[in-house]
Amino acid sequence: LRSRGLGDVYKRQIQEYLSSLRGKTAAVLGIGVSNTPLIELLCRNGVQVIACDKKSREALGERAPQLEALGAQLHLGEAYLDDLRADVVFRTPGMRPDVPALLEAKARGSIVTSEMEIFFEVCPCTIIGVTGSDGKTTTTSIIAEMLRAAGKTVYLGGNIGHPLLCDAEKMQPEDFAVVELSSFQLLDMKRSPHIAVMTNLAPNHLDVHKDMDEYIAAKENIYLHQHEGDIAIFNEDNDICLLYTSPSPRDRSLS
């Protein structure tokens, strides 16, 4: 569990991060249900938001005028990634970080990140991350319900729930953030959860990943950046999981 003193430090980091974006431009790629709260958060904190989506204005329906009322500028249609210019670009979890539009934005000086990566940096409470080829959602939901049954305050996010960055300011050090993480979200993550759970590994999403090695390398990011005392839990009945999980001085649990 995180200490209250450390929690105050993280809360200041959240406020400082949002303050650092005030007056700057942030492009949010994807105007789905999950990204709308992120757009709202940024707009409320004085960020000039460019909300980008492949959908047309008609397809977005009421969401388009609602976002414009908040101050967001919309960049819609098939060319929504063309000439992407912003101080910060929040990529959607399902988008590879090496697509040409993002590489070009980086070359122009943009910081390309994701809502989840920023959340990991500023979260004041214990993060439990769950990944795997199958069973992620079920396992994530079970962990969250077990903690709630124990009287804990739990924030559910990642592939399920909503953007947790929006909740970070109200989180307490004794709370838990339980996060489902896909291989796409983990692909370029440089931080790992305090408790990492890998349900299993099997060939999956190879239409998007270059090969099985890249897919597994993405999954391994759930624990590769952990610190001493953090915990990683693996499924010992899954041969691929055991084969590819590298040894480490950090705590390891097989179940």
Describe each region flagged by the PLM:
Residues 1-10, 244-255:
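Single conserved hydrophobic/aromatic residue that forms the stacking wall/gate
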Residues 82-86, 93-236, 240-243:
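Phosphate-binding loop of NTP-binding sites
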Residues 2, 35, 123:
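Short, conserved glycine- and acidic-residue-centered signature motifs
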Residues 24-25, 66-70, 152-153, 243-246, ...:
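Secondary-structure boundary/capping motif
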Residues 11-114, 118:
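N-terminal leader/targeting and accessory segments in enzymes
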Residues 2, 27, 197:
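Conserved Rossmann-like nucleotide-binding pocket used by diverse enzymes
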